[in-house]
């Protein structure tokens, strides 16, 4: 429009106002790179309410510029004036759609399928295998629970709430804990002292036929020094029983 000078210009209604006219699309860019090649044609693609525009570039690898954006239906008052520099007239055209496109940075324009792409059949197989494994695990756990419930009703076993196993505890006797492997010295001393007393009584009973021996043995009391109260009581009672039995035998 740099060639437009001051003055009056004619405005002619365009073919877009007729019923059988071609449609007009208005595009608004966020910016247009300087490397766009205006000498070559681009490609415009439409998918539902979105547009994708490919414009050629001046790059050595011939990588195009990609623009993507949404579109909306134009209103009845949305129009555009097209200026003809030769005839010095404007043509008024009605706009059908308005698109706002944004340039993509480092767009992926490769036509090859990526190596990590998964097809629909692969997805279906994966989903079927997952569902099969899940159903198998669910079936096994359900059968196990049903068997445990049936066995518990028959009185055989009780259903277990977990898989944890604990060692069996015997109820035949009290539970003891060995804190020390060494024997009780006090018990051993009492046992040894009892054996000595029994041995002394046996010697006295064996020599009962000799009156002199009996009198000597009976007249000699057993020393209770260095003994505990329990040992003294045990020795005194044993000595008294031995003397009484010896006197009865003499009678």
Curated annotation (Swiss-Prot):
Residues 124-135 have a biased composition (Low complexity). Residues 143-157 have a biased composition (Basic and acidic residues). GO terms for cellular component: super elongation complex; transcription elongation factor complex. Its main location: nucleus. GO terms for biological process: transcription elongation by RNA polymerase II. The keyword Disulfide bond does not apply. Pfam families: EAF. The modification Phosphoserine is found at residue 247. Disulfide bonds: none annotated. Residues 110-187, 201-251 are annotated as: Disordered. One of its GO terms (molecular function) is transcription elongation factor activity. Residues 112-123, 204-220, 236-251 have a biased composition (Polar residues). Keywords: Activator, Nucleus, Phosphoprotein, Transcription, Transcription regulation. Belongs to the EAF family. PANTHER family: ELL-ASSOCIATED FACTOR EAF. Forms a stable heterodimer with ell1. Ell1-eaf1 complex interacts with RNA polymerase II. This is Ell1-associated factor 1. It comes from Schizosaccharomyces pombe (strain 972 / ATCC 24843) (Fission yeast).
């Amino acid at each position: 429009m740099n060639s437009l000078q001051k003055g009056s210009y004619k405005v002619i209604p365009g073919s877009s106002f007729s019923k059988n006219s071609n449609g007009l699309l208005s595009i608004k860019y966020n910016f247009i790179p300087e490397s766009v090649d205006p000498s070559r044609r681009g490609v415009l693609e439409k998918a539902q309410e979105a547009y994708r525009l490919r414009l050629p570039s001046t790059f050595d690898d011939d990588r195009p510029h990609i623009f993507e954006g949404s579109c909306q239906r134009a209103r009845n008052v949305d129009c555009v004036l097209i200026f003809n520099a030769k005839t010095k007239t404007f043509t008024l055209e009605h706009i059908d759609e308005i698109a706002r496109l944004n340039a993509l940075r480092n767009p992926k324009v490769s036509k090859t399928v990526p190596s990590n792409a998964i097809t629909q059949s692969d997805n279906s197989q994966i989903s079927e295998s997952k569902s099969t494994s899940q159903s198998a695990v669910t079936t096994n756990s359900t059968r196990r629970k049903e068997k445990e419930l049936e066995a518990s009703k028959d009185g055989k076993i009780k259903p277990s709430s977990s898989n944890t196993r604990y060692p069996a505890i015997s109820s035949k006797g009290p539970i003891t804990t060995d804190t020390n492997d060494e024997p009780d010295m006090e018990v051993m001393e009492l046992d040894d002292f009892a054996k000595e007393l029994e041995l002394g009584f046996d010697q006295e009973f064996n020599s009962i036929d000799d009156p002199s021996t009996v009198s000597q043995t009976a007249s000699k009391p057993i020393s209770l020094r260095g003994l505990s109260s329990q040992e003294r009581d045990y020795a005194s009672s044993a000595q008294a029983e031995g003397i009484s039995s010896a006197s009865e035998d003499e009678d």
